[in-house]
Every structure is written in structure tokens, then in C-alpha cells.
């Protein structure tokens, strides 16, 4: 269920502070975060944010079409390798 428009987008305070610092400094260094629940806001466009997927930090280059989505949508947590193949049926 989507968040109410009157509440506005949710972004963790520590992440918002890091984003503002990176924008001021013009830094291209990835910002590490564990906050998959934070929404991408227009101030993040052009930054690289390393989002934790449970094992490692996945670098996500934020572009304009990502605004309004959550960071966790771009760092997959599951590794699907396909269904098991029956070797006898393959012959």
C-alpha cells in the first residue's frame, strides 16, 4: 500500500544528511547505506548510493526515472539461477 501524499516521502535522517553533504561537496564517492526503505528524492539524482542487500553493498547510480521508488528495489536480495534441469530428459 502506498504512503499517503500528505505525509510525504520517507528518507532516513542519516542518509539525508550524507546526501546533502555529497551534493555540497560535489563528491562522486558512493554513499553506503543500509536503509533500503528510504525513498529516492530529486536531490539524489546523479549520486551513487551503495545499498546493502544482506550480503554486500550494491552500487546504484540514481537517475531521474528512479525518483519516487525505494532504494531496496534496485538492490536485489535473492539470486535466482533457474529451475533444476533433469539431465535424463535433456538427452
From Swiss-Prot:
GO biological process: ribosomal small subunit assembly; translation
UniProt keywords, alphabetically: Ribonucleoprotein, Ribosomal protein, RNA-binding, rRNA-binding
Source superkingdom: Bacteria
GO cellular component term, pick one: cytoplasm
GO molecular function: rRNA binding; structural constituent of ribosome
Database matches in NCBIfam families: rpsS_bact (TIGR01050)
The family this protein is said to belong to: Belongs to the universal ribosomal protein uS19 family.
Task performed by this protein: Protein S19 forms a complex with S13 that binds strongly to the 16S ribosomal RNA.
Protein's recorded name: Small ribosomal subunit protein uS19
Organism: Alcanivorax borkumensis (strain ATCC 700651 / DSM 11573 / NCIMB 13689 / SK2)
Gene that produces this protein: rpsS
